[in-house]
């Protein structure tokens, strides 16, 4: 299965596996694409620490996290 996997360390770091790229980035908002939809992280001082083909690590003060499925892709 190629499902997204998220690992959080408190609200200070999120490691995202099985992504399809970054759609939007700012220090207050990061949008990451998946096969099934998108993940939206909002917070303060968000920084992409590492980005690899299958994994992204984002640090900062994460205040909210939303996972949205695209219709017809459940």
Predicted regions and their residues:
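N-terminal intrinsically disordered, cationic/polar leader segments
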Residues: 1-74
């Amino acid at each position: 299965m190629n499902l997204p996997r998220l690992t959080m360390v408190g609200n200070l770091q999120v490691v995202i596996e099985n992504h399809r790229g970054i759609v939007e980035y700012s220090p207050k908002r990061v949008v990451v694409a998946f096969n099934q939809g998108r993940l939206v992280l909002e917070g303060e001082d968000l920084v992409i620490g590492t980005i690899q083909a299958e994994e992204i690590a984002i640090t900062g003060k994460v205040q909210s996290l939303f996972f949205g499925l695209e219709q017809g892709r459940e």
